[in-house]
């Protein structure tokens, strides 16, 4: 099965998520075990488009081949991302330094198990530093950004039961905002509640 992706509206950030969900549904509903995702029509992508696809592809049991990726997708490390725990710290720092003057960081795939917490902290510090330098963020805003990222990633470590977490960010200076996407392929919020002994929540709507 060949899935040809549609381009998304760069004025509507949420359009990327719906486009990613559409692709995921096509793959899940297909009886084919071998599928191709064709990016030839893609000129613009957002973190909310790219990262859900990365997480899904890396966790999918089917054989998925990605074709016709543009230079931007190659530069951000689609589909496996940069894996800091698989390289020397100096190598990771050198890779990240290459992005210090860009408006984005590569997709970072980091260890998300509790026993790798120290590694996660070192990786997060590097990512935060690059984003702050890229945007020239003031110290008080930087503190808020670091707190937000730390809380989101700690939630993955503590509750998601996921082997890896992912983070990807792109800024849009002309539009005045920063788009950060953090994801995992864990047990979901509902699944986390169901692990509690006194849980009474049975469905997502609750």
Feature annotation, model-predicted:
Residues 180-206:
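Glycine-rich/acidic phosphate-handling loop/turn and adjacent ATP-lid/helix
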